[in-house]
Amino acid sequence: MPAETRDWYDTPLQYDIIFDADTPREADFLEAMWVEHGPSGPPGRVLEPACGSGRLVLEMARRGWSAAGFDGNASMLEFARGRLAAAGMGALLWQDRMESFRVPGRARFDLAHCLVSTFKYLLTEDHAVSCLRRVASVLKPGGIFVLGLHLTEYGRATPDHERWVAERGGIHVTCNTRTWPADPRARLEAVRTRLRVRQGGREHLQETRWHFRTYSAAELHRLLRQVPELRLAACHDFTYDAAAPLRLDGSHLDAVLVLRRR
């Protein structure tokens, strides 16, 4: 079956079906990091840059947080607003970019988060630094930014493959993501995702291609040194085990950083 070329962010329901299963676990981890590394107190204000389908915006709102988020994709934001309305929950949502966002009004946040490698869409060092500085500028002193991304194995010579399968309401989605070996000079890696969607006896295949910026542990440390407003308080991985901190030393290929606002 030939694949239709389409941005998977323009199909938010299918995207959400794949990733929503991890939402409660991610929210549990965010709250655990808040308790361990943030200021004491009840849930406050939380910001999600690149909030996508709004799954974590809704989950955090349900847990008593005053939630806000932005995304660059209008289809994702429309989906997020719809799910919040259906749940009878409210949140501040707006369209913006990670490297240049501005929060409406003068809101300041206790917690911010950006998981599942979305940060790697920022393809230049300047944009990455700008994003971190802007997040720092809207965090209250002592607030935390939880940032998750896959690190790059520069010596790898073959493509990497990940596969997810999920179903909701009679819609069955299989997601296959392939990442090609990185170009260490350009610090880019090519990525392709294929979504196979089956519903009511019909099947559809769509494909999205893009590039990510690459990071080794050393490159990530160098980036963080350019934003002294944020201090690395802890490092974990995508198991989201709050009781198992790790070192950001290249010994593992995913990193969930807890950055504390000075």
Q: Where are the model-predicted features located?
A:
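Conserved SAM-binding strand-loop segment of SAM-dependent methyltransferases
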Residues: 86-100
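A short glycine-rich, Lys/Arg-flanked "PGG" loop and its adjoining helix->strand segment in the class I
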Residues: 129-141
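A short acidic, Gly/Pro-enriched loop at the edge of an enzyme's catalytic core
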Residues: 103-111
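Conserved SAM-binding loop of SAM-dependent methyltransferases across substrates and taxa
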Residues: 53-65
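Conserved beta-strand signature within the Rossmann-like core of class I S-adenosyl-L-methionine
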Residues: 142-149
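Conserved SAM/SAH-binding beta-strand->alpha-helix loop
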Residues: 73-75
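Conserved class I S-adenosyl-L-methionine
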Residues: 1-44
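SAM-dependent methyltransferase
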Residues: 149-222
